[in-house]
């Protein structure tokens, strides 16, 4: 449910940012997307009432966007804050009970979500570059840096000790749509004159993001299973140490009583 909410918020961010920077009329698309975002957040609220603050924050942000009281950079940064707060919930959910220790698998899952975040921003920026070259003056370095961040995160997860999650990500990188998307990202970094139908790029990159979203969901399930196993083991360990300490205490008490008794009540010869 959290991953779905993040997905919808990222989509809304892309449309909001595109509309703000270009002359495109995306009001209908934005309205439809906001409804989808609201539906995802509503489901999330059924599970966690703390997300009401996220809903309020988003409502204020939308009002600023609609009334043009916000810059394009602020649009991105404010949506990133919302996504980050939801990612933090993943940490809170996937923390071993009463130990407060975040699972290593959870850290890997969060990295995949962050990679997806970078990919979503790349889709938005390159879409704008295809629609309106002037809208992205000076953004080439940003595209290059986002792509570097994305690759760094993906490489870290693939080389991690969590074999199951690493294998999931390897399969994602080998998908044909994924290869096409990143070939074009590299082309956008090398060339100033991009020749591609904007709708085709949006379709390809969106499919890749959806594939990565599915990978995130599967990785989250793996992390949850790992958490359950770790929690069960933690409970067993705690019970073992509890009974062990009780046994030691009983043995010590027995020896103390024996010694005291022998001192004050020596055996008669």
What is the predicted role of each segment?
Residues 1-249, 253-265:
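Hydrophobic alpha-helical segments
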């Amino acid at each position: 449910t959290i991953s779905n909410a993040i997905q919808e918020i990222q989509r809304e961010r892309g449309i909001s940012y595109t509309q703000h920077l270009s002359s495109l009329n995306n009001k209908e698309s934005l309205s439809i997307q906001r409804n989808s975002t609201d539906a995802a957040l509503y489901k999330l609220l059924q599970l966690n009432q703390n997300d009401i603050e996220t809903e309020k924050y988003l409502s204020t942000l939308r009002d600023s966007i609609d009334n043009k009281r916000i810059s394009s950079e602020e649009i991105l940064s404010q949506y990133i804050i919302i996504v980050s707060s939801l990612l933090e919930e993943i940490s809170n959910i996937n923390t071993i009970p009463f130990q407060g220790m975040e699972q290593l698998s959870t850290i890997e899952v969060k990295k995949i979500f962050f990679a997806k975040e970078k990919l979503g921003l790349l889709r938005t920026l390159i879409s704008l570059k295809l629609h309106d070259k002037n809208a992205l003056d000076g953004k080439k370095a940003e595209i290059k840096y986002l792509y570097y961040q994305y690759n760094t995160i993906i490489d870290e997860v693939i080389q991690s000790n969590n074999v199951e999650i690493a294998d999931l990500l390897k399969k994602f990188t080998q998908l044909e749509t994924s290869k096409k998307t990143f070939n074009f990202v590299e082309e956008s970094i090398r060339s100033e004159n991009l020749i591609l139908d904007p709708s085709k790029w949006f379709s390809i990159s969106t499919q890749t993001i959806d594939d990565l979203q599915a990978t995130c969901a599967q990785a989250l399930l793996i992390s949850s299973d790992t958490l359950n196993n770790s929690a069960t083991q933690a409970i067993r360990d705690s019970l073992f140490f509890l009974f062990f300490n009780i046994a030691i205490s009983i043995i010590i008490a027995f020896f103390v009583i024996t010694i005291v008794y022998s001192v004050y009540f020596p055996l008669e010869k």
